[in-house]
Protein backbone atom coordinates (compact mmCIF):
# COMPACT_ATOMS: atom_id res chain seq x y z
CA UNK A 1 0.00 0.00 0.00
CA UNK A 2 1.38 3.42 -0.94
CA UNK A 3 1.49 6.49 1.31
CA UNK A 4 -1.21 8.03 -0.90
CA UNK A 5 -3.44 5.02 -0.32
CA UNK A 6 -2.89 5.45 3.43
CA UNK A 7 -4.08 9.06 3.08
CA UNK A 8 -0.65 10.62 3.68
CA UNK A 9 -0.26 14.18 2.44
CA UNK A 10 2.32 16.94 2.65
CA UNK A 11 0.88 19.41 5.15
CA UNK A 12 0.51 23.03 4.11
CA UNK A 13 3.25 25.34 5.32
CA UNK A 14 0.57 27.24 7.26
CA UNK A 15 -0.39 24.16 9.32
CA UNK A 16 0.86 23.49 12.84
CA UNK A 17 4.21 21.71 12.93
CA UNK A 18 6.57 20.26 15.51
CA UNK A 19 9.65 22.38 14.82
CA UNK A 20 11.71 24.24 12.25
CA UNK A 21 15.01 23.00 10.82
CA UNK A 22 17.73 25.51 9.95
CA UNK A 23 21.07 24.63 8.38
CA UNK A 24 24.14 26.32 9.84
CA UNK A 25 25.98 28.20 7.06
CA UNK A 26 28.41 25.97 5.18
CA UNK A 27 31.91 27.09 4.22
CA UNK A 28 31.88 25.07 1.02
CA UNK A 29 28.43 26.18 -0.10
CA UNK A 30 28.31 27.86 -3.46
CA UNK A 31 26.38 30.67 -1.79
CA UNK A 32 27.66 33.63 0.20
CA UNK A 33 25.47 32.67 3.16
CA UNK A 34 28.58 31.73 5.13
CA UNK A 35 28.92 35.47 5.74
CA UNK A 36 25.56 35.53 7.56
CA UNK A 37 26.12 33.43 10.66
CA UNK A 38 25.02 36.23 12.99
CA UNK A 39 21.74 36.66 11.12
CA UNK A 40 21.08 32.91 11.38
CA UNK A 41 21.69 33.09 15.14
CA UNK A 42 19.31 36.05 15.55
CA UNK A 43 16.64 34.38 13.42
CA UNK A 44 16.89 31.04 15.25
CA UNK A 45 16.78 32.71 18.66
CA UNK A 46 13.71 34.79 17.83
CA UNK A 47 11.93 31.81 16.27
CA UNK A 48 12.69 29.67 19.33
CA UNK A 49 10.36 31.86 21.39
CA UNK A 50 7.45 30.39 19.40
CA UNK A 51 8.52 26.86 18.48
CA UNK A 52 11.31 24.32 18.76
CA UNK A 53 14.31 25.00 16.50
CA UNK A 54 16.79 22.40 15.25
CA UNK A 55 20.04 23.69 13.78
CA UNK A 56 21.77 21.19 11.51
CA UNK A 57 25.51 21.76 11.33
CA UNK A 58 28.19 19.99 9.35
CA UNK A 59 30.62 18.28 11.77
CA UNK A 60 33.28 20.81 10.75
CA UNK A 61 31.03 23.64 11.99
CA UNK A 62 29.30 21.89 14.88
CA UNK A 63 31.31 23.46 17.71
CA UNK A 64 30.69 26.98 16.44
CA UNK A 65 26.96 26.39 15.92
CA UNK A 66 26.66 24.73 19.32
CA UNK A 67 28.44 27.59 21.08
CA UNK A 68 26.23 30.23 19.46
CA UNK A 69 22.86 28.42 19.55
CA UNK A 70 22.91 25.94 22.46
CA UNK A 71 20.75 28.10 24.73
CA UNK A 72 17.74 28.17 22.41
CA UNK A 73 18.03 25.37 19.84
CA UNK A 74 18.89 21.71 19.44
CA UNK A 75 22.09 21.31 17.41
CA UNK A 76 22.47 18.20 15.27
CA UNK A 77 25.76 17.22 13.64
CA UNK A 78 24.91 16.00 10.14
CA UNK A 79 27.25 16.15 7.13
CA UNK A 80 26.07 18.85 4.74
CA UNK A 81 27.57 21.16 2.16
CA UNK A 82 24.53 23.25 1.35
CA UNK A 83 22.98 25.97 3.48
CA UNK A 84 19.43 25.95 2.10
CA UNK A 85 17.56 23.23 4.01
CA UNK A 86 14.48 23.76 1.86
CA UNK A 87 16.34 22.21 -1.07
CA UNK A 88 17.98 19.28 0.68
CA UNK A 89 16.18 18.73 3.98
CA UNK A 90 13.49 16.28 4.99
CA UNK A 91 9.94 16.38 3.71
CA UNK A 92 7.38 15.06 6.17
CA UNK A 93 3.95 13.71 5.38
CA UNK A 94 1.07 12.96 7.73
CA UNK A 95 -2.30 11.30 7.61
CA UNK A 96 -5.62 11.68 9.39
CA UNK A 97 -4.49 9.17 12.06
CA UNK A 98 -1.72 11.61 13.10
CA UNK A 99 0.95 9.27 11.72
CA UNK A 100 4.05 11.02 10.39
CA UNK A 101 6.51 9.69 7.83
CA UNK A 102 9.48 11.06 5.93
CA UNK A 103 9.81 11.12 2.17
CA UNK A 104 13.19 10.60 0.55
CA UNK A 105 13.46 12.48 -2.73
CA UNK A 106 16.59 12.31 -4.84
CA UNK A 107 17.47 16.00 -5.16
CA UNK A 108 19.10 16.58 -8.54
CA UNK A 109 20.15 20.21 -8.29
CA UNK A 110 17.22 21.65 -10.21
CA UNK A 111 17.48 19.27 -13.14
CA UNK A 112 21.23 18.55 -12.83
CA UNK A 113 22.11 22.19 -13.51
CA UNK A 114 24.80 22.01 -10.83
CA UNK A 115 27.44 19.29 -10.71
CA UNK A 116 27.71 19.44 -6.91
CA UNK A 117 24.06 18.48 -6.30
CA UNK A 118 24.02 14.72 -6.54
CA UNK A 119 22.19 13.54 -3.43
Q: Which residues does each predicted region cover?
A:
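The feature marks the mature, well-folded catalytic cores of soluble enzymes
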Residues: 1-119
Amino acid sequence: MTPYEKNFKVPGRFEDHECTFITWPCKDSDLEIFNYENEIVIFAEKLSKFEKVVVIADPSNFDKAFKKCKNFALIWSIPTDFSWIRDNGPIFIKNDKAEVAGVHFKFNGWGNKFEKCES
